[in-house]
UniProtKB/Swiss-Prot annotation:
Full protein name: Putative transmembrane protein ORF710
Membrane-crossing residue ranges in chain numbering: 41-61, 76-95, 689-709
One GO CC annotation: host cell membrane
Provenance organism: Acidianus two-tailed virus (ATV)
Segment forming the signal sequence: 1-33
Disulphide bridges, residue numbers: none
Top-rank lineage group of the source organism: Viruses
């Protein structure tokens, strides 16, 4: 039956009305891929006292190291001057002209546009240094492409004494991994072509790393030299003696003298000595810088038993220490190509060498003793064994053992070196000096201590690389304090300790000794003017967990009668006057999952009732993130007092250009005043609107947000 004209008109009006209502939402809500690619980390600051003047904050962030862009915003929707000092571990520094108790947001992701993320903008308050040879006094260290490598033989770094000495400063150091303080595993996973030679260096990278074949630049392989046997014999003469890995049978002798080698046009890796004296090439040998040349690269050697004393194999991929520029340049068949990452090789590192002999039944592997090797085959099977036996040479930093395995149909090799059993010794004093005494943190064989004027303090804990080290000093009257924190990818180690000496103007200072290298990426220091505040009792910082950009975030303090209520899509906090009530009750969230993070311990719960109490102490700063789409709640519990935040007042006469987002016109006459009695959720709404507006440009759509203000 056909609809009459009146009904048709009514139906069209209804459809049109629905479209009009939905249309604004299509602009406000991006695609799922956009939302999912953006996350925010709330940072809660609570002051117990008034603080005048600008403040510089530092905060470690528990976020992945591979994120793209970011910006910092406060709860009023204003962009902040900020700098991401390190991404691994993530460590952010930002400036606030007039600090108050509020919540900040670190927003990051693929679709985020970076804002105020340059040292030029931030240089009003902090100086960031990438190493060069003129600014620093360096002994027993090498600077290459902005990365400083200290070799461990009484290596010392200080600022040039002609540079200004700071009366008060907070020093930041970005320390990359040494060669391998706590080795985990090294991985080579690829089809093994016939005649391949694979050299795996044990270096700064810790963790499993998959290497597709062929190993070329875009795969970011930091420690593989993969060779394929393809070239012909070279013309032999009396001046060419090459080291060769036999393509038909593994060469048993690893000690082959290499007199001076002239440049050869064939691609390959040339080992030579400019002094024309003999060089011994063996696993783990230290090859001087003159042992490499970049104008022609190949690996060659004496062909054993044939009378032919020169031979070459073409490399498909080569990586050597001399070609690293700030961890971003490698050489591929004579051409420099960029890669990503910050890796540092050391010439003294030992090597794991595999010779695949045309998929024979007796392939051989030279690997560290106690390492675990897993060989995978094309039929899906795998074979694992522990490397045992006598070292092929004495005097190596790690005993290397020759082992054999069935080599037909090999598709991958996995070498786990987490069981070296090697005692690697090192001691790093990182901090500052006033030329009378030294201060900072002392890291000895993985254990960290505070270090005050020659006295080693209590142990802070076991630390791992990479890390950020922050060390500073301040005075309260005539009493001087040294404070700092060590930030790793998994933990934060703060400290504050009184100095028995008056601290004079300071400069940067690092003193390192060890059997493995120490790599420093960059250094920052804050301004010398102003006063550092003792943070105990003055301010508390609570860094939340990463949450989706569309999460509702509440910044509250646990207390009897505190309720967080979810009703009809709205979320708000309220206080019920009941001194015997729990310190936090979740109302209306039955079925939600809870992640409770308290003192670095994570607990997972499920909300089983509509009035669900959460067992927490009172007077604890809480960051509560509620994602209604995934029906999940993340509660990050801060401390009543903390020393993990460092502040420094900026002179009052320092001017700061205002950088703010457009102020939206909210429905009704809602006026947000920092001194008003509005609850924290009203402040968050402004931040949320500003964040949404950042994703779509400067225009803010009005009239579709529903606010719930208690």
């Amino acid at each position: 039956m056909k609809l009459d004209r009146k009904k048709k008109r009514l139906l069209l009006k209804t459809i049109f009305s629905i479209v009009i209502l939905i249309l604004p939402l299509t602009f406000l809500h991006p695609t799922n891929s956009t939302v999912s690619s953006q996350n925010q980390v709330p940072i809660q600051i609570i002051y117990n006292y008034n603080v005048s003047g600008g403040v510089i904050y530092t905060a470690p962030l528990n976020i992945p190291s591979g994120f793209y862009n970011y910006y910092m915003i406060n709860q009023y929707g204003t962009l902040l001057y900020s700098y991401l000092f390190s991404t691994n571990p993530a460590f952010v520094v930002w400036y606030e002209p007039q600090p108050t108790t509020e919540t900040y947001y670190f927003v990051y992701g693929q679709s985020v546009t970076s804002q105020l993320v340059s040292t030029d903008v931030f240089s009003l308050y902090t100086q960031f240094y990438i190493y060069n040879s003129s600014m620093w006094n360096i002994s027993n260290g090498v600077v290459s492409g902005g990365v400083l490598t200290l070799n461990g033989k009484n290596s010392i770094l200080t600022e040039n004494y002609t540079a200004p000495r700071y009366t008060s400063a907070l020093w930041l150091y970005q320390i990359l991994s040494p060669q391998s303080v706590s080795p985990t595993q090294i991985v080579y996973t690829s089809p093994i072509p016939p005649g391949s030679l694979i050299i795996v260096h044990v270096l700064t990278y810790t963790g499993s790393y998959q290497v597709p074949y062929p190993a070329i630049a875009q795969y970011n392989t930091p420690y593989i030299i993969a060779e394929s046997y393809t070239s012909q014999y070279l013309t032999a003469n009396s001046t060419h003696y090459y080291y060769y890995y036999n393509s038909l049978k593994y060469v048993g002798s690893m000690q082959q003298s290499l007199p001076f080698i002239t440049t050869v046009s064939t691609n390959g890796l040339i080992f030579y000595s400019s002094a024309k004296n003999s060089q011994v090439l063996l696993p783990g040998a230290t090859l001087p810088a003159t042992s490499y040349t970049t104008n022609s690269t190949f690996i060659a050697g004496q062909l054993v038993g044939t009378g032919i004393d020169s031979y070459s194999i073409n490399p498909s991929f080569v990586w050597c220490p001399e070609w690293i520029v700030n961890g971003s340049i490698q050489l591929l068949n004579g051409c420099k190509v960029p890669i990503t990452g910050h890796y540092q090789l050391d010439k003294s590192t030992y090597a794991v060498i595999l010779n695949s002999v045309f998929n024979s039944s007796d392939d051989e592997l030279i690997a560290p003793v106690n390492s675990i090797v897993t060989v995978t085959y094309s039929n899906g099977t795998s074979y694992s064994f522990t490397v045992t036996g006598s070292s092929i040479y004495s005097g190596l930093p790690v005993p290397l053992v020759v082992v054999k395995f069935y080599g037909v149909g090999v598709t991958g090799i996995h070498i786990s070196t987490n069981a070296f059993g090697i005692n690697q010794q090192y001691s790093a004093l990182i901090g500052f000096t006033d030329l009378l005494h030294t201060y900072g943190v002392l890291i000895q064989n993985g254990e960290a201590y505070s270090y005050i004027a020659g006295t080693k303090g209590p142990a802070l804990g076991n630390v791992t690389f990479p890390m950020v080290v922050a060390v500073g000093e301040f005075a309260v009257g005539n009493t001087y304090y040294v404070f700092g924190e060590i930030v790793t990818t998994s933990r934060v180690f703060p400290f504050i300790q009184q100095s028995s000496y008056a601290i004079q103007p300071t400069i940067a200072y690092v003193n390192y000794n060890g059997t493995i290298p120490l790599v420093i990426q960059s250094v920052a220091e804050t301004l010398s003017t102003g006063t550092y505040y003792e943070l105990s009792g003055i301010a508390a910082m609570n860094v939340g967990q990463p949450t989706p950009i569309n999460s509702v975030i509440l910044s509250v303090v646990s207390q009897p009668g505190l309720e967080i209520v979810g009703s009809n899509g709205n979320v708000y906090s309220t206080i019920v006057q009941n001194t015997s009530a729990p310190n936090l009750v979740l109302v209306g969230f039955q079925g939600y999952s809870i992640t409770l993070v308290y003192t670095n311990v994570q607990q997972n719960l499920v909300v089983t009732t509509n009035n669900f109490p959460v067992n927490l102490p009172s007077d604890m700063p809480l960051l509560v993130a509620i994602d209604q789409a995934s029906r999940s709640i993340t509660i990050t519990v801060g401390q009543t007092q903390t020393q993990s935040i460092f502040m420094k007042t900026i002179p009052v006469n320092t001017t700061t250009p205002a950088v703010s987002l457009p102020i939206p016109n909210y429905p009704g006459n809602i006026i947000v005043d920092p001194e008003s009695e509005l609850t924290v959720i009203s402040y968050y709404i402004i931040g949320a609107v500003a964040i949404v507006s950042m994703a779509y440009g400067t225009k803010i759509w009005i009239g579709v947000f529903i606010f719930a203000i208690s």
